Amino acid sequence: MTSPSAPSSAERPRLPGALDGPRLAAAAAEHGTPLWLYDAATIRAQIDRLRRFDVIRYAQKACSNLHILRLMREEGVHVDAVSEGEIERALAAGYRVGGDDEPIVFTADLLNRSTLRRVVELGIPVNAGSPQMLDQVGRAAPGHPVWIRINPGFGHGHSRKTNTGGEHSKHGIWHEHLEESLALVDRHGLDLVGLHMHIGSGVDYGHLESVCETMVKQVRMAGRDIRAISAGGGLSVPYTPGDPEIDTDRYFELWDAARRELVSELGHPVRLEIEPGRFLVAGAGVLAAEVRAQKPVGSNYFVLVDAGFNDLMRPAMYGSNHRVSVLDADGAPRASDARDTVLAGPLCESGDVFTQVEGGDVEPVPVPRTDVGDLVVFHDTGAYGASMSSTYNSRPLIPEVLVDGAETRLIRRRQTVAELLAPELEPGPALSPRPSRDPR
């Protein structure tokens, strides 16, 4: 079989913004591999593409590092939190609570007791994805500000596991139960801020138009004098060559037409929010890993790197594709002929493979020939990379680095094994020793 050609310099994925090969290699040498790197200018450029919306509300679950959150806040971006921990992250990053512009909104499909106490204490608006949330908030704090997140009966997503609407999605209040939810709002005197619909459409503008029409229909059915609507998130990112780039102006214009229709009916301004996550940060981030082994296995050729799905979960969970490039230890690109390669990690887990499709089938991809010590760069990993990482196989969390113009700074140091073990070694109730079995 003839080896495929390596991508030309024009086809080779580019590092984001001010990040180049030598800077990446220098960061890897200083902080070790694997590590995450983000480019601040790329994030700012993505924010600017959405400035026509009244409120950009960052879905911090995409990348919740405090330094990224501070960057968002400095750019005037508001934040969405989906857990008590994310509320505390937003506060630690300098977000305030209160005010008409609602810097922090809490979105979920349930409220545990601790989080309920915290949102009530802080007065954070709750975007409710179940009727029980409305009832629980109302009992704890009559008059509390709320949104209603509606599941309109259809959905969209790049994977079945990311579909956020329809009867197979847990998210949102089923559209046929809107009246029941409004009755709870009335019973507890809750302050209904607006309606939220997180469906996403990517570049399917016909689908997006249907989503916008459904929002107008739901507001009419509600018959309430709301102050805002939220378009949710779901803006697509071109992960692979040939993926179309989303037209953010067209996206806004479709939503703005829906908003203007509501303004004419309600007789006052209606705030239009959007809730992007990966759109803002995916293209700004890369994961750099070192080649540690390579071997033929039957008809496949494996290159093994020191990052695993504990670091980058998306390929194993969704079958997601991330473009890769290869640099030598000094940061120069490898430009040799490509070879069909299976890229895999160090975990004691058969599914620890980066080149697989949804369902788990291994799919070799053309990769320039590598040497042990080279750096493999996984592109467009700024979203749902570090924030979804784990300590599986007792592997500590890895560093994060932010490149901002000429400055390169560490924004999360590498976790130590001692820190990983600490919660299990802290003083607690003494355990009665169990007798050892006689090995004979």
Swiss-Prot record:
Catalytic center residues: C348 (proton donor)
Cofactor names: pyridoxal 5'-phosphate
Enzyme class name: lyase
Function: Specifically catalyzes the decarboxylation of meso-diaminopimelate (meso-DAP) to L-lysine.
Name listed for the protein in its UniProt record: Diaminopimelate decarboxylase
Gene name per UniProt: lysA
Keywords assigned: Amino-acid biosynthesis, Decarboxylase, Lyase, Lysine biosynthesis, Pyridoxal phosphate
SUPFAM superfamilies: Alanine racemase C-terminal domain-like (SSF50621), PLP-binding barrel (SSF51419)
